[in-house]
Amino acid sequence: AKKRSRSRKRSASRKRSRSRKRSASKKSSKKHVRKALAAGMKNHLLAHPKGSNNFILAKKKAPRRRRRVAKKVKKAPPKARRRVRVAKSRRSRTARSRRRR
């Protein structure tokens, strides 16, 4: 029997499924983000709409709107695998630059 391709269109009810959301949020955890960075996947990490330091691992074919790469990730150190904290909240950085002025 021919294996069915994975690119099958997902039904609306499947898209709303909790397990899918849960697996997505799991992948946005810092541990996953660090692992992905270490694997050189920084272009697949998108800024998460909700959290300051959550990222979503996105597929290359994600719609352009969702494909915006998180700014904080771009500057991630090459030693991301060993670093514990990768993402600092954006707010603290802007506050720091304001203080400097």
Swiss-Prot record:
Residues 1-101 are annotated as: Disordered. GO terms for molecular function: DNA binding. Residues 1-35, 58-101 have a biased composition (Basic residues). Residues 3-22 are annotated as: 10 X 2 AA approximate tandem repeats of [SK]-R. Residues 32-65 are annotated as: Globular. GO terms for cellular component: chromosome; nucleus. This is Histone H1-like protein EM6.
